[in-house]
Amino acid sequence: MFASLKLALVYLALGPIAGIIGIPYTLLVGDITRLYRVAMWITNAGVRAAGIKIDISGLENIPAGRSCIFMSNHVSNLDPPVTIPLLPGRSSVLLKKQLMDIPILGRAMRMAKFVPVERGSRRDAAQASVAAAGDALRSGLHILVYPEGTRSPDGRLSTFKKGPFFLALETKAPIVPIAVSGTQTMMRKGSNAIVPGVARIRLLPAIEPSDYATREDLMRAVRNAIAEALPTEMKPADYLTMAL
């Protein structure tokens, strides 16, 4: 409870100040880089204030000078605020389309090239999201996606959606798999309470989409890489048969 309160206090104290000053400045100059850096600093400060320690490895696996698609398992609402500030440069994320309709903030999100997604949307809307993500990659940004599509209900790696792999094959952007563990016990699904602990972030060797003949082969390779890096209790139920 106290950890959640500390995180909330940091965000409530610093977030509005950054927004009041940063968003108008960003809209005026047409460059979101400074606001993004401030937002990442505040995000990281809140995480650490909540008593969350971060153990990260594998940053050397990010291909230099190339826009990447980071693909991570998803076990907690803490995953994005723990992970994104650690990634170099700027990263775009996929978010609910409705958030883009918020006055001023929505415009800033569009400037940041965040990608709007409609859950359960029709085919053309999904294709529009893929196109927007491709545009973000071509502009030099990274993309962070959770190919499971939602948080795992039990902490184990779930099945993957095909959309992110279509994006990877279309753009030929390297995929950097990420294995996240620890956050599933710090903020469980369905709860807002935070329990201090250690979040372990493992960035794995990059996977080149062009090395795979089909989307299914690429998806299998990424899922296998993440599964292999997760602790036993988080490996998928089909782990023993995945490589067969």
What do these predicted ranges mean?
Residues 59-63:
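Glycine-rich helix-loop-beta junction characteristic of Rossmann-like nucleotide cofactor-binding loops
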